[in-house]
């Protein structure tokens, strides 16, 4: 069952990336595990990481909860403004828009990102 859930998530992620690959816009790509959450802003060509934030940083320990996701969202918004990125496409990597994913997205929007 676990393998089927992962396959379905990866299929959803592939559909999003195929649809947005031709658009000339940066992606805010996230990944979550049971203990951590990661966020990266990837260039429009898909080959360069412009900014990143995760709960692996010393300031953002205890990363398996919604509060840590909010802090990562704020950090990625701050990092994005430092590299002059305002508009992104939110790539949730096939994860449901609920809980930690939603908290990260809301915090990034409040930080100034537009998606």
From Swiss-Prot:
GO terms for cellular component: cytosolic large ribosomal subunit
Family annotation (InterPro entries): Ribosomal_uL18_bac-type, Ribosomal_uL18_bac/euk
GO biological process, one term: translation
One GO MF term attached to the UniProt entry: structural constituent of ribosome
Domain of life: Bacteria
SUPFAM superfamilies: Translational machinery components
Entry keyword set: Ribonucleoprotein, Ribosomal protein, RNA-binding, rRNA-binding
Pfam families per UniProt: Ribosomal_L18p
Keyword rRNA-binding on entry: yes
Description of how the protein assembles with itself and partners: Part of the 50S ribosomal subunit; part of the 5S rRNA/L5/L18/L25 subcomplex. Contacts the 5S and 23S rRNAs.
Function of the molecule: This is one of the proteins that bind and probably mediate the attachment of the 5S RNA into the large ribosomal subunit, where it forms part of the central protuberance.
Annotated family: Belongs to the universal ribosomal protein uL18 family.
Protein name: Large ribosomal subunit protein uL18
């Amino acid at each position: 069952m676990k393998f089927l859930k992962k396959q379905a998530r990866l299929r959803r992620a592939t559909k999003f990336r195929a649809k947005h690959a031709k658009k000339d816009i940066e992606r805010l790509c996230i990944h979550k595990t049971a203990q951590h959450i990661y966020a990266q802003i990837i260039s429009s060509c898909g080959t360069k990481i412009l900014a990143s934030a995760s709960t692996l940083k010393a300031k953002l320990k205890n990363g398996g909860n919604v509060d840590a996701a909010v802090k990562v969202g704020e950090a990625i918004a701050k990092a994005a403004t430092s590299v002059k990125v305002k508009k992104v496409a939110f790539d949730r990597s096939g994860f449901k828009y609920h809980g930690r994913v939603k908290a990260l997205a809301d915090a990034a929007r409040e930080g100034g990102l537009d998606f």
